[in-house]
C-alpha cells in the first residue's frame, strides 16, 4: 500500500488522493507554519479575553475533563499555573483505567491543589453493553469513525455530555479538554456551545446507545431543564490547540507532578487499557488505524517526524492486554 511521502496517510483512506509526487491532498492543503502561528496567537488571545469576562462568575472558572493521560495532565497544569484559573477536575472511569493512572491522578490534583470528582457509570448494565456492541457494529456516522473507533467515540461522547451537564448545573463558563494539536484543529479550540447544535449532536450519539441499554442512557445526557438555560451553556476549549506542543518537554514537566507512564498502555493513549482492543477491532472492521488522521496531522504540523508517526500506528497490539479486555467484556 502506498503512503504519502510527506505524512503517513495511505492511498485507500476515504477522500485521500495523491499527486504525481506521491503527496496527499491533506498535505497540499496544509496551512503554512507562519499562518498556523498567527492562528495560534489569535485563539490564545481570544481565550484570554473570554477568561477576563468569565473569571470569578461561578464557583469554578473551568471544568477540566481529566483522564489522567499525559496531554490532559499537561493541560491541567497550564490552566492552573499559566492561566491562573480556579479548576474543578472531572474524571470519567470507563472501567479500564490502569492502577498507575489512579495514582497519577491523585498525585497531580494534590500537587496542583485542585478540586476533583471521579464519576464511574455502572459497568455491567451500561458500559459493558455499549463497548461490546461498539466492538462489532459501526454505531456512528462514517465521518466520525474516520477519526476514532466506535468504542472511543462512545466513551468520549459520554464524557462530553456529562461534563456539559455539570457545567450548566454549576454555572461553570468553560469546559476544558486535553486534545492534542493532531486531534482537533486550532479553529475549533474555542467553541461557544449553542443548545440547538448540542441537541442535534446529542441525538446522533444518544440514539445508538439508547437502542443498546434503553431509557437508562438518559441519565448521562442533558434534560429539558438544561436546555432551558441557554445562557449557562459553556465554551468548550482545548488549550493545546493554541499552545506550544513538544511531547518530550510535556513528559518532563508532568514527571515533576508525580506522573509516570502506566504499564500496558500504548503510544496513543497513556491512560486507558481499552484503547488497544478498540484499535484492533477498528482496524479489522475498516482496514485503517483509528489514529491515522491524528498522527498524520502531527507529522504535517512538525510535532513528530514521519518515522515516529509510523511507529505510532502499529497493527499488532499487546496480546496480553487485548485478551484481558476481551475477558472483561465477555467476548
What function would you assign to each model-found segment?
Residues 1-62, 78, 82-331:
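Nucleotide-activated chemistry modules centered on ATP-dependent adenylation/adenylyltransferase
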Residues 62-71:
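Short, glycine-rich nucleotide/cofactor-binding loops
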Residues 74-75:
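Hydrophobic positions on the alpha1 helix immediately C-terminal to the Walker A/P-loop
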Amino acid at each position: 500500500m502506498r503512503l504519502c511521502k510527506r505524512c503517513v496517510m495511505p492511498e485507500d483512506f476515504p477522500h485521500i488522493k495523491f499527486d504525481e509526487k506521491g503527496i496527499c491532498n491533506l498535505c497540499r492543503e496544509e496551512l503554512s507554519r507562519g499562518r498556523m502561528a498567527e492562528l495560534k496567537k489569535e485563539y490564545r488571545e481570544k481565550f484570554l479575553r473570554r477568561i477576563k469576562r468569565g473569571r470569578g462568575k461561578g464557583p469554578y472558572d473551568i471544568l477540566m475533563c481529566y483522564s489522567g493521560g499525559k496531554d490532559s495532565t499537561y493541560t491541567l497544569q497550564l490552566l492552573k499555573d499559566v492561566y491562573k484559573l480556579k479548576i474543578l477536575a472531572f474524571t470519567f472511569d470507563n472501567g479500564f483505567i490502569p492502577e498507575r493512572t489512579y495514582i497519577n491522578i491523585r498525585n497531580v490534583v494534590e500537587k496542583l491543589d485542585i478540586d476533583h470528582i471521579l464519576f464511574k457509570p455502572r459497568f455491567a448494565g451500561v458500559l459493558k453493553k455499549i463497548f461490546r456492541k461498539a466492538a462489532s457494529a459501526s454505531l456512528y456516522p462514517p465521518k466520525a469513525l474516520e477519526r476514532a473507533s466506535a468504542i472511543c467515540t462512545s466513551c468520549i461522547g459520554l464524557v462530553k455530555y456529562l461534563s456539559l451537564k455539570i457545567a450548566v448545573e454549576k454555572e461553570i463558563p468553560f469546559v476544558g479538554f486535553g486534545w492534542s494539536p493532531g486531534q482537533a484543529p486550532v479553529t475549533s479550540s474555542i467553541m461557544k456551545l449553542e443548545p440547538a447544535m448540542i441537541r442535534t449532536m446529542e441525538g446522533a450519539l444518544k440514539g445508538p446507545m439508547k437502542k443498546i441499554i434503553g431509557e437508562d442512557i438518559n441519565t448521562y445526557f442533558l434534560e429539558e431543564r438544561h436546555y432551558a438555560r441557554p445562557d449557562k451553556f459553556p465554551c468548550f476549549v482545548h488549550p493545546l490547540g493554541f499552545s506550544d506542543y513538544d511531547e518530550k518537554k510535556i513528559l518532563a514537566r508532568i514527571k515533576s507532578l508525580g506522573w509516570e507512564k502506566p504499564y500496558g498502555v500504548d503510544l496513543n493513549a497513556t491512560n486507558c487499557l481499552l484503547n488497544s482492543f478498540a484499535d484492533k477491532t477498528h482496524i479489522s472492521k475498516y482496514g485503517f488505524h483509528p489514529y491515522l488522521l491524528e498522527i498524520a496531522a502531527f507529522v504535517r504540523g512538525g510535532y513528530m517526524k514521519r518515522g515516529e508517526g509510523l511507529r505510532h500506528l502499529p497493527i499488532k497490539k499487546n496480546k496480553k492486554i487485548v485478551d484481558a479486555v476481551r475477558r472483561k467484556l465477555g467476548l
